[in-house]
Amino acid sequence: MASVLLPLPQVFVLFDYRRSRKESSFPRAVYNSNSISSNSTNANHFLRRISNFCETGDLDKSFRTVQEFVGDDESSSDAFLLVREALGLLLQASGKRKDIEMGRKIHQLVSGSTRLRNDDVLCTRIITMYAMCGSPDDSRFVFDALRSKNLFQWNAVISSYSRNELYDEVLETFIEMISTTDLLPDHFTYPCVIKACAGMSDVGIGLAVHGLVVKTGLVEDVFVGNALVSFYGTHGFVTDALQLFDIMPERNLVSWNSMIRVFSDNGFSEESFLLLGEMMEENGDGAFMPDVATLVTVLPVCAREREIGLGKGVHGWAVKLRLDKELVLNNALMDMYSKCGCITNAQMIFKMNNNKNVVSWNTMVGGFSAEGDTHGTFDVLRQMLAGGEDVKADEVTILNAVPVCFHESFLPSLKELHCYSLKQEFVYNELVANAFVASYAKCGSLSYAQRVFHGIRSKTVNSWNALIGGHAQSNDPRLSLDAHLQMKISGLLPDSFTVCSLLSACSKLKSLRLGKEVHGFIIRNWLERDLFVYLSVLSLYIHCGELCTVQALFDAMEDKSLVSWNTVITGYLQNGFPDRALGVFRQMVLYGIQLCGISMMPVFGACSLLPSLRLGREAHAYALKHLLEDDAFIACSLIDMYAKNGSITQSSKVFNGLKEKSTASWNAMIMGYGIHGLAKEAIKLFEEMQRTGHNPDDLTFLGVLTACNHSGLIHEGLRYLDQMKSSFGLKPNLKHYACVIDMLGRAGQLDKALRVVAEEMSEEADVGIWKSLLSSCRIHQNLEMGEKVAAKLFELEPEKPENYVLLSNLYAGLGKWEDVRKVRQRMNEMSLRKDAGCSWIELNRKVFSFVVGERFLDGFEEIKSLWSILEMKISKMGYRPDTMSVQHDLSEEEKIEQLRGHSEKLALTYGLIKTSEGTTIRVYKNLRICVDCHNAAKLISKVMEREIVVRDNKRFHHFKNGVCSCGDYW
């Protein structure tokens, strides 16, 4: 723009001068749409035809009709006004439909008539049309061609820049107007200028404009006031915005919506709804009932706070006010339901919406992506791409879909998406290119990640962060450290995101030395002030097991955020200290810190690891007291916690009580049934899940396979493994194969299990799979295979005592005592010790522990006495000590005596002594329950008429009336 503009201080002087002048600078010739004579039937009919054509979108027919009426410049005044009004309707329709080609045809038609092109009203309409079509340069061209410019035309061009978010140009034009003309801004000018100030980082300019508003006496104007409220809210000055709102002499619905949005955007969720209630209470006559803009403003609050109840209430208002057909509102509702974990509700709205736009599709793609549902994400995406030319995917679509490809099994889908993006030239967008770099790295396709990265013309810190972050989350995080060195060579310095990725890589590598180097760089460059960086440092030391350092860093934090508390709780949990994790939780409660759903997840996780159903119930009570029970994360954690504490009935109650079931909640319940060996229930729930429209994911199949494994359903387990691959396109991981191999091995199909390892698995078998095979070799006394598997285990984990114990037990079962002695001698030479069997039971808010063979504990004589009675009773029912469970070369009498000292028997007997009749006994054991204790517990449950629940390190056993839930298959 070639113009010499005055700085703002001089502009103030000009304003003072102009306001002292008597004459008004405002033009008086205002266009009046009623200027056509009302008794002109033909004229009215003509305008109705034009209006109808515009409403139906038939702009070509409308244009041809108007074109016939454009005559010479000497036509009558009435005819001229008629044509002008018709052209105005057509220009407005072209702008609404963003039909710039039609707009240009009209512009050309107007330019051909001297009288039309000199008409102020039409010129203003043309400027506005180009603005609506997203072409502010054309608006400016028309404006600059005007010989004389009135305020409406200045407002139109300022509005054009504002509408298209060219905020620098807005201010330049505004200053040009007040510097070079005698015109004073009005209540149409200022809202556009103030909006521009809101979109700029320099708050001072907005404050200066506010000063001009005060000088011109427009501060009490409702339109200007609304703009100022939004300006202060956008820059985070919530108190100032509220003060302006409170002193407004007149408020319209936009005023209320603006203030509600200020609260919403600045995280004042409760205040948003309180103000909404105040708006409706003050105007009970319906004058200010919520409109689409109101509801669209409060829905993100519901999503952010995961307040599904409030979200449904807003949805109810939409239906009641008959706004539920509005596209923008439906899109907001879909977004809210998706972010609250209710993807099914979002799908229902999506399917019922016949007028979908790209935002609708993007919302659904993003919803499935946020759930980690790759199958659902690509289903919606393919439907969108198959829809023809009506709706086209854009960069946002790709950015929503790409993150869901985070594993090598999703590489084909990622490549498919990449091809489409290349064809549409989306990859030239830096954000899209960065997303592909990160996802290719996460999927392990480093060559593709590098190829996309090198294709970025101008690499920024963000580009390097995408590569470094992707490598950090890949199977080889060392590559992120190499990329960091290349970044430094290129002359770019790491930022907060870079160091967070590097810390993540060090955490995965458990490299304390490298992590400390990164921490040193952070301290030297004052990056510790960034909360995310500080939390990443905490996470590093947590992964490296440096809990003293974690506690010291946490204690040094002046302002402890909720996330920092959660990080420390999770850290103790990950390092096997659930009691300390609960101690931190108690501190939070004492300090009055309000926990959210996500915060409670590690608390329930800690309760799952401790032998205390009581603690879990207390945590549940806390969630109920603070109205967190409807949170999707809480629901899943509760289901999991009760299942792992042996109360599968309570898990089922929580699940069945959910109003909205997410994929995660289905998975938690299926896995709960799985670890309890309730295969029929797990399979039934799996089928019901699919009927309700939820797509199973890899965790769903893990739960089903676990259930089949614990129940010995080999045929069904293999069928579900095949279905996972063929029907759902999911690639089994090591956990899935571990279930299948354990299932085959315990059924005696050892050769088949070994073939699965050798032929079907794309990854190298981990120690868990080899341990499972060795355990199966022990059960079925397959010495040859057992020794080969043990050799593999010793190669992978040479210092794990349980590997030697498994081999020793195999030899003992075959009576090869000399080999047993050699294995134990080798363990002694390596200073390896077998974990002693230990069991726990909670009684009267205390946890009692029992170690195998322990004879010096309080109440031992009482335990010994009751066990003698119990042994006598169950012997009459057929109990015979299973001395094969003793892995030592002893006499039969010595073996029987050793069986009596097993920790689960001690805990069970003590529980019977200390509890009243009919009470369920819950025992927790660190190792797998032996055959002898299993047989004894079954018969004791019948003799004593008690339900006994034993959780060992593999699964749950529910003993009742002489029967175990595992069906003697474990």
From Swiss-Prot:
Keywords, in A-Z order: Repeat
PANTHER family tied to this protein: DYW DOMAIN-CONTAINING PROTEIN (PTHR47928:SF146), REPEAT-CONTAINING PROTEIN, PUTATIVE-RELATED (PTHR47928)
Name by which UniProt lists this protein: Pentatricopeptide repeat-containing protein At1g18485
Superkingdom of origin organism: Eukaryota
Record-linked PROSITE patterns: PPR (PS51375)
NCBIfam families in UniProt: PPR (TIGR00756)
UniProt GO MF annotations: mRNA binding; zinc ion binding
Region Type DYW motif: start-end pairs: 876-970
Family the UniProt entry places it in: Belongs to the PPR family. PCMP-H subfamily.
Region listing for Type E motif, in residue ranges: 770-845
A Pfam short name: PPR_2
PPR repeats: 119-149, 150-185, 186-220, 221-251, 252-282, 291-325, 326-356, 357-391, 394-428, 429-459, 460-494, 495-529, 530-560, 561-595, 597-630, 631-661, 662-696, 697-727, 733-764
Region (Type E(+) motif): 846-875
